[in-house]
């Protein structure tokens, strides 16, 4: 069953799984061609049965370590997640570790497939940012891998968690718009089937109630967490008969899209509509006008997350740090930071 040196090969796995060596490679490398769920599971079972380990980690496994941690994010095109990935990479390299990065592309099936890939590659730890919460596939890492989950309210009992109080952050941003005298504050939410979207919307509503302002469902537009999503939601709000003088976006990319919609429609920001957003990045300094955002301390949070992943034995709950950065879009003086 094995080659002459006694080493299990992909050919052995293919024989046990009843498939081709190419298909085994697609499963191990997570591409480049798709593999059906049933066939993928068959290959994974064959890998477990034969004891096969992917090339590149065999020597490290013999020493009991791979020197690699994984980072799985839902969409690397999201500027905040790009900054997080960069910061995690820096924190890992400072500790002599490699990073294996996975991008789910906002697809739960892709997310599950990538989790299987991390298991196969025997990462020592996994930093996980879910498409929407924690999928059941995370349980497969319970006995083998340290896990830290970002911004989840349903993290498994064995995992560490780093979480921003997104409701409080949204409250602070919306309340700041109200401080500028805005009375009708609209919101671009994320997809409403995602829990974090609902938490951010709750923060918006609580801020309005605290100021005695009206909650109006006509002031809400749901959109993907993207520039195009924010642009399309902005078009709908501007073209509607709804009167609004403030806008809170659930993330920075949506806010950037909204600014573009305002520019095309001749809506002045902040004169006509004051704007603030959640999960800002350095990009907010360079929009026109510059964007007021609640920004997480990404570098510090990444350092804390990696250190916790490597050192803490019992599951820890870490509070992500951040603050509101006031720039021009809300009516404050611009701050290029």
Predicted regions, residues:
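Flexible loop/hinge segments that line or gate small-molecule binding clefts
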Residues: 128-172, 193, 213, 253, ...
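Short acidic capping loops at alpha-helix termini that bridge into adjacent secondary structure
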Residues: 183-184, 215-219, 268-272
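Amphipathic helical "hinge" segments at domain boundaries
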Residues: 37, 41, 50-117, 121-124
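Hinge/beta->alpha junction and helix N-cap segments in small-molecule ligand-binding domains
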Residues: 74-83, 101-110, 161-172, 188-233, ...
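Periplasmic-binding protein-like
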Residues: 122-130, 186-189, 220, 241-254, ...
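Flexible loop/turn connectors
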Residues: 235-337
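N-terminal helix-turn-helix DNA-binding module of bacterial transcription factors
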Residues: 1-66, 334
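Short beta-strand segments enriched in small/hydrophobic residues
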Residues: 21-25, 61-75, 184-191
